[in-house]
Amino acid sequence: MGRMLVELGNITEREHNQNVRSSSKAGKSSFAYAWSLDSSEEERARGVTIDVAHDTFRTKHTLFHLLDAPGHKDFVPNMISGAAQADAGLLVVDSITGEFEAGYSPQGQTREHATLLRSLGLQQ
């Protein structure tokens, strides 16, 4: 979500560069885009989204309210509170070999999130 917000101009180049510097200094350079929405010290230290983050962006014809919800199993209640506010969902999945498959296993987090989204009425 952070990369999309940077590309759309919602996160300025200056803000993004600050996230790049800060994440590199913390030894988490690959988290620079995530830090666009994960702004608390705890989220940044742990490397996971904990609370639902909000942002807004506009296209030519539509105003979007973005809710970035946690994906970690410890924060499923927070994910549910974010998803319950949504009209549509975008489930971002890990594409690393092994991680992707684990997410869709019977006890996988991706499978659980997809099931929760459907049970909350998100059809798209």
Q: Over which residues does each language-model region extend?
A:
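P-loop NTPase switch module centered on the Walker A-proximal segment
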Residues: 1-77, 86-99
